[in-house]
Amino acid sequence: MDLSKYRPSSAYDSPFLTTNAGGPVYNNVSSLTVGPRGPVLLEDYHLIEKLATFVRERIPERVVHARGASAKGFFEVTHDISHLTCADFLRAPGVQTPVICRFSTVVHERGSPESIRDIRGFAVKFYTREGNFDLVGNNVPVFFNRDAKSFPDTIRALKPNPKSHIQENWRILDFFSFLPESLHTFAFFYDDVCLPTDYRHMEGFGVHAYQLINKAGKAHYVKFHWKPTCGVKSMTEEEAIRVGGTNHSHATKDLYDSIAAGNYPEWKLFIQIMNPEDVDKFDFDPLDVTKTWPEDILPLMPVGRLVLNRNIDNFFAENEQLAFNPGHIVPGVYYSEDKLLQTRIFAYADTQRHRIGPNYMQLPVNAPKCAHHNNHRDGAMNFMHRDEEVDYLPSRFDPCRPAEQYPIPSCVLTGRREKCVIPKENNFKQAGERYRSWAPDRQDRYINKWVESLSDPRATHEIRSIWISYLSQADKSCGQKVASRLTVKPTM
């Protein structure tokens, strides 16, 4: 008997029903009872196994990005950037790398409507020859807070009230009134882009600054941008209500049906490049995640294209168990000093261990598609076959050795050990610039959203005044229009 042939896979299904241990099941409808009326006997092993498996089917949902959909495809380099990075998957035009991509909403539960106003996740896992590279981003280029110390509170404020389980504006406005840097993200959150028509018609951003390093060890800061070839489309509030009431999975269905029909979604990848020597030349901190880089000074440079041409085979195995981690990088790519990114490196791996288990990287959807070797061993649900006698390094009995060193950016850091904010906060300028770039009807929708939120009966006069002050500092006319509709005067 070829024992390796029958590893767990639907490819080796038997023609008849069996237990988990492979024993035949001749009746899948009736429990084993004493007579036709019962009682049920505990010795009905298949009944117990079936029920026990059923009640353990679900794993903890993601604390954020619980609602999502995935698809597979490839990334192809279209423009040479080998002068910027030694990353193998970016080595030359024409190089293709298999990927899996997951789109999601951020705040709400796994079964919530995909039409709800929310930031969308846009995460791409590149299965490169040098290991996995996870670019874990969103459909907006900034985030609410620049320091991860506030991240748990940020998500709790956005999530439903723990008493009533209802999302309420007064909670959101109360918390973020203490974070003036959040206004720039609200200029996206309350804008049309947080009601995307579907996943195919939205942009993606790496959000954080990263570093690309070339063979000579020269590093540049970069930001990643995904641009959909079919354009960006959004819904109005009324359209979102109608779509959500018709089909709460409309974006998942659109993605799945489009790929099945051969209408493959495609995005172009662009980068912005900044020389580290230029970081202090701006009136904001370029490593502040609440800021964007000006495209007139740092223009978008084309890199490649992402094509999703294959639907996943199993939603649970390749969406629910799919695990991303910003800590997964490859030679030629490195982190920046962005405070939020630095913390995500730990938090994402930790949440996957809690959600899926300590050996989540052994799952096929998460495992690298290249040869790999380490001495991380055993643990719950370990299913990796190992027959080594040496489980330590270094050893004269094991030929494994450390990998050849690849370039990483050198950095000399000095400073006091302290808890503090960055010196160049500049919290309102970019929010105002974004507002002024819109057509009048788009500005009006943004103002209406603020009026709706600030009209929450539990939003106090103090909270309203703070937000009108923030809006006025971003754009005086915007703050005045919101104030006039609320009959609240700005307090500057």
From Swiss-Prot:
CDD domains: catalase_clade_1. Keywords: Cytoplasm, Heme, Hydrogen peroxide, Iron, Metal-binding, Oxidoreductase, Peroxidase, Peroxisome. GO terms for cellular component: cytosol; peroxisomal matrix. In stems, leaves, roots and developing fruits. GO terms for molecular function: catalase activity; heme binding; metal ion binding. Transmembrane segments: none annotated. The keyword Oxidoreductase applies. Its EC number is 1.11.1.6. Coiled coil: none annotated. Induction: In roots, by aluminum and salt. Expressed with a circadian rhythm reaching a maximum at late in the dark period or early in the light period. It catalyses: 2 H2O2 = O2 + 2 H2O. It is found in: Cytoplasm, Cytosol; Peroxisome matrix. Pfam families: Catalase, Catalase-rel. Catalyzes the degradation of hydrogen peroxide (H(2)O(2)) generated by peroxisomal oxidases to water and oxygen, thereby protecting cells from the toxic effects of hydrogen peroxide. Belongs to the catalase family. Homotetramer. This is Catalase. It comes from Capsicum annuum (Capsicum pepper). The gene is CAT.
